Amino acid sequence: MVVSLSFPEADPALSSPGAQQLHQDEAQVVVELTANDKPSLSWECPQGPGCGLQNTGNSCYLNAALQCLTHTPPLADYMLSQEYSQTCCSPEGCKMCAMEAHVTQSLLHSHSGDVMKPSQILTSAFHKHQQEDAHEFLMFTLETMHESCLQVHRQSEPTSEDSSPIHDIFGGLWRSQIKCLHCQGTSDTYDRFLDVPLDISSAQSVNQALWDTEKSEELRGENAYYCGRCRQKMPASKTLHIHSAPKVLLLVLKRFSAFMGNKLDRKVSYPEFLDLKPYLSQPTGGPLPYALYAVLVHEGATCHSGHYFSYVKARHGAWYKMDDTKVTSCDVTSVLNENAYVLFYVQQTDLKQVSIDMPEGRVHEVLDPEYQLKKSRRKKHKKKSPCTEDAGEPCKNREKRATKETSLGEGKVLQEKNHKKAGQKHENTKLVPQEQNHQKLGQKHRINEILPQEQNHQKAGQSLRNTEGELDLPADAIVIHLLRSTENWGRDAPDKENQPWHNADRLLTSQDPVNTGQLCRQEGRRRSKKGKNKNKQGQRLLLVC
């Protein structure tokens, strides 16, 4: 059974004439109902940016945050699947249903250049027609969406864990480790997070700020750690690492003070591609690459004044500046030169299947520090190739020219000529299949016992190196030995260590009793009432803010 979904058009009265050239194709959404009545998504991905958003009065902060969420690839995929609204029991006033409608209308009807008005369900509980902190609104929205998902899960499965699509996309785990400096005993505590706050007071780059987050902190004097093994307060060290990496990484540059709201307006560089592996508590396997897809920017002196806007990366790879109703194209250089407030990165574990592709050839070049070190050493000890001293043309061009000038027919004639000179005759007697294949390739067989390695080389046709001296080749011919295609290498056993969509509960099964914290904002007042925490066996509840 195939059901086509259609959605109402955006308000034409809010159309932006100048934005119509930025949008082209309207996506087509088709939900296929499987045998067990679970919808599987099959849709043509929207390529352009979403609609502009109307400023209803000091609402630029929420417009900028909503644009970043709308262009979050995993979240957009989930919203466009309409999976949540099909199971929601109370869609009226539901934040998840409201976000689903917002993302769907913005992305599926962006071809006409319409300007949307954000839903009051998303804004009314927070927006009071005055400037607010965009990061605070962002975390408030994610929290309320998470709570909406939990209500649906608890109604259908009362014993279900406190997980949701919001946790699956944005959620990660901190590991806080305290080590007693006397007995060397350690105590680990794990806390959930939706964003990573970075202290930029002394950092020149995001990478440096991430390293500063993991610096060891000494606990002495009044802050000494009570060691269960020593049975008294002892000096200790405390370190904080990311234990479980999220699918979408939100890096919040702490530009505003907690009390006065004054802004730290300094330049902090950030990369287009980020490797999170060095900052993990257990950095195993290959690189863990992330790609930048959105940047939230603030212009002004305090968080309660000035102006907010954002940059987003569309599915086809182009960048756009989303400034309320204005949607303008830009380049990545402009994006990387901004004084960013919140950075949005999406995990790129599977480079060929993600929404925003990172160039495969640049993975090691951009992300792996060890590769950079080896590369610099090779440059120092690399000898000058005699091929480059040829006054004719570079060796790569000569190889291409030689390859192009030798056709398949000429190669067959040359092969037959070489066979005759080598004195090889084809017999009509019954041959072993392996010998038939070897003769077709023009290879000689040794009568004595052949090693397994040599058998493999002959099967691959690599014994040509032994017959180069017998071939009658032109004087200017170049023999190129090509390996078999490596296109399918690694497909049978892909890297499973850096898979996205980490399950926090699965990571904690082999650990000691764990402290799970509530979802909190970096700073600012709480706008919503959290559900009652269940004191599960072996856990103590910890409020992490």
Curated annotation (Swiss-Prot):
A Gene Ontology MF term for this entry? Answer: cysteine-type deubiquitinase activity
Annotated region described as Disordered, given as residue ranges: 368-442, 489-539
Report the transmembrane regions from the record. Answer: none
Note the CDD domains from the entry.
Answer: Peptidase_C19E (cd02661)
| Keywords associated with the record | Endoplasmic reticulum, Hydrolase, Nucleus, Protease, Thiol protease, Ubl conjugation pathway
Where does it sit, as one GO cellular component term? endoplasmic reticulum
Q: What is its EC number?
A: 3.4.19.12
Chief location: nucleus
Enumerate composition-biased segments (Basic residues): 374-385, 524-537
Q: What does it do?
A: Deubiquitinating enzyme that removes conjugated ubiquitin from specific proteins to regulate different cellular processes. Important for preimplantation stage embryonic development.
Q: What is this protein called?
A: Ubiquitin carboxyl-terminal hydrolase 17-like protein C
